[in-house]
Amino acid sequence: MLHVLSLAYHGVTCPMSNSTASSVAVTKAQQRFDHLAWTLNGEAWEKSYKRLFLKSTCHQVVSFVENVCDQTASLVPSITLGGHNVLYPVRCDGDGFDIVVRQPCPDLVQFREEKTRDEGATISYLAQNSAVRVPELFFHTSSSRIGPAMILLFIKSERSMSDALADPGKDPGEIRVLDPEIHEEDLRRLYGKMCRLLIQLFEPTLHTIGSLVEVGNNHSVAGRPITHNMNDMHNDLVDSEDDCRNKYVARYLFHLLAKKGHLSAFGFLEDNWSAQSQSLELSCSMPCGTDSFRLWCDDLRPQNILLDHHDNIVAALDWEFAYSAPTQFSLDPPWWLLLQLPELWPSGIDDWSQVYEARLRTWLLAMEDEKWGEGINFPANLSTYLRESWLSGRFWLDYATRKSWAFDTIFRKYPE
């Protein structure tokens, strides 16, 4: 079985426990949309969507490959449309290898030029400066006759990490959820492979916040961070005067805490202001706030990790929303242990937290099994940081910081 470099849709929808609950949760999420903007975007995307599959478009893609690779090429079925990108499989006749031309979808993805430039630089940086396995990047450009594009080597794989973790009883059309019957040994083994990947990603340090830019063979943090949240920006429409007031106050208080530097210390040994700090014995010091940042990817999740027939990772895909970020983000346990978002869990955040906490124990055991790289110089084991992040609520703070769609739900639930 071969997997092309593809994405599952990961906008506001997310995995649900059953199809009915999924429909209800998605409907509630859509009620928060700006319907005028949604309609206009939909109409523009419908026109662009049709153009992606025209013969003339495919000929332009093949011609682009021939010019870059300096050999004849042909399109290979079939074109794959993901959540943010369209992928054209192409065979270079001279060398006989398959590549993929990956382009951000027009009228669906924002900041297409920046996104492609930054993703190309990130893949190149990881290939040169980490042990993370990424697709081989032949070429990338933010502007060409066909628009922003990358040429990547086609990746042969058996399945994705999401396939390995998901409930096999789900219908193909249903959005995936972690298999509730998965054997603990299998879960720990698969989690361990993801732990190793995150440790490899944690090792390189960067000097400031922003996106990587490549000039020649040199990389630097010189662009603004293009986040997933920017692509699906929440405009915070309000339902009533009370709703408007509550949202304003929540954001004002959040801004005030950030201005005082409290958010950086929250959930760490230096935290002397929060309610949690009075009841918990925290042992992990906060990371340095200057000249020590980590590469973070908003879209790093099991769906984008390809495995071979031994379930070894052959490639981590889709680095489009990757940027140098506060190290705190990397010291939280990953949200995707259950393969779905907490704010859209049909039984509510409390139930999500209970199920998540049980799986987090397995994740922490898997993390403790992994060896640290020489580049990680922290006073405590990484698993200790992850554990204290969950216990203190730092997990929720950072999650709400990155996701404006979830901010109000989380702030109301965890105001302390």
Name what the model sees in each region.
Residues 67-68, 129, 413:
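Alpha-helical structural context
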Residues 2-77:
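Juxta-kinase regulatory segment immediately upstream of eukaryotic protein kinase catalytic domains
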Residues 101, 298, 317:
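Active-site flanking residues adjacent to catalytic metal/cofactor-binding acidic residues
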Residues 75-273, 292-295, 311:
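ATP-binding pocket architecture of kinase catalytic cores
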Residues 58, 62, 116-120, 187, ...:
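A structural signal for well-ordered alpha-helical scaffolds and beta->alpha junctions
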Residues 296-302:
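Canonical protein kinase catalytic loop motif
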Residues 168-182, 200, 212-296, 308-315, ...:
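Intrinsically disordered, low-complexity intracellular terminal segments
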